Amino acid sequence: MIQKNWQELIKPNKVEFSSSGRTKATLVAEPLERGFGLTLGNALRRVLLSSLRGAAVTAVQIDGVLHEFSSIPGVREDVTDIVLNIKEIAIKMDGDDAKRMVVRKQGPGVVTAGDIQTVGDIEILNPHHVICTLDEGAEIRMEFTVNNGKGYVPADRNRAEDAPIGLIPVDSLYSPVKKVSYKVENTREGQVLDYDKLTMTIETDGSVSGEDAVAFAARILQDQLSVFVNFDEPQREAEEEAVTELAFNPALLKKVDELELSVRSANCLKNDNIVYIGDLIQKTEAEMLRTPNFGRKSLNEIKEVLASMGLHLGMEVPAWPPENIEDLAKRYEDQY
């Protein structure tokens, strides 16, 4: 069946986020099919860095300054350095319309992003960021234009044709995600040792959490990839009927070699042709102890494992074993 191409691929049953402050987060997702750690990690990283929207300064006007190659009396930095510092201001802004912010300060002292006067829907996320340093008697006034956008926009594209003299365009780095790294390691699921474990570290400017940034990036990928799906979802009526008619606990379809028993116990079950938990729980303690090389220690180990699943030896299972046991085991593997 067509749907087996995607339905039978393993999906992560563990997706965990841990945060370190407002700007850093770590994602761990496992298990993934072999190769999917690299595929998903690289795709998410590229989208995180390039496609999420954020706010940035697009232009600045400084009183008494005509162009960025000027210097300002009493200001230690030249205008070029001031513009570079302005590019690093982290901003969160609602809405799509351009907004303006103003800063005015007298020396001596340091002008920081926290000195900027903002309107209600603009938040400065790094208020301690230094813009420039004023000497005694110096004064500066700057007016910033702020926009929302995505990706990187160079200053020449922020230069309006009707811009007034003295309006200096600024390179805009809109992305709220500043750094993304990932690594892929092997992980275990049952007796399979070569599934992928994806670990991603995301650093943002604080306008969005790392967890939300990953969610937005995944949604972008989902939307972009959907155009390539040229068929309707196959009907699963027969499978759904089989699901509702199952006469026993789906956990009985799990194979005993996934119980992580000791080697001795596992070999004894294998030699006795006990494949599924449904086979095992129908055995009595006396029957198990008659198995070659199977002792009281192995019996107690198995009883403890079964008890953790709400099962025990000597149970009766109706309609066991089902004729299509292998197909049922695959169908229900996500439920146990």
UniProtKB/Swiss-Prot annotation:
Region annotated Alpha C-terminal domain (alpha-CTD), chain positions: 248-336
SMART domains for the chain: RPOLD
Pfam hit, one: RNA_pol_A_bac
Keywords: DNA-directed RNA polymerase, Nucleotidyltransferase, Transcription, Transferase
Sequence segments annotated as region (Alpha N-terminal domain (alpha-NTD)): 1-232
UniProt GO molecular function: DNA binding; DNA-directed RNA polymerase activity; protein dimerization activity
CDD domains, per database record: RNAP_alpha_NTD
Gene3D superfamilies in UniProt: 5' to 3' exonuclease, C-terminal subdomain (1.10.150.20), DNA-directed RNA polymerase, insert domain (2.170.120.12), RNA polymerase, RBP11-like subunit (3.30.1360.10)
Catalysis performed (reactions): RNA(n) + a ribonucleoside 5'-triphosphate = RNA(n+1) + diphosphate
Example GO biological process: DNA-templated transcription
EC identifiers of the protein: 2.7.7.6
InterPro entries: DNA-dir_RNA_pol_insert, DNA-dir_RNA_pol_RpoA/D/Rpb3, DNA-dir_RpoA, RBP11-like, RNAP_asu_C, RNApol_insert_sf
Domain of life, source organism: Bacteria
Cellular component GO terms held in the UniProt record: cytoplasm; DNA-directed RNA polymerase complex
Function: DNA-dependent RNA polymerase catalyzes the transcription of DNA into RNA using the four ribonucleoside triphosphates as substrates.
Protein family per UniProt: Belongs to the RNA polymerase alpha chain family.
Subunit description: Homodimer. The RNAP catalytic core consists of 2 alpha, 1 beta, 1 beta' and 1 omega subunit. When a sigma factor is associated with the core the holoenzyme is formed, which can initiate transcription.
Domain comment quoted from the record: The N-terminal domain is essential for RNAP assembly and basal transcription, whereas the C-terminal domain is involved in interaction with transcriptional regulators and with upstream promoter elements.
Protein name: DNA-directed RNA polymerase subunit alpha
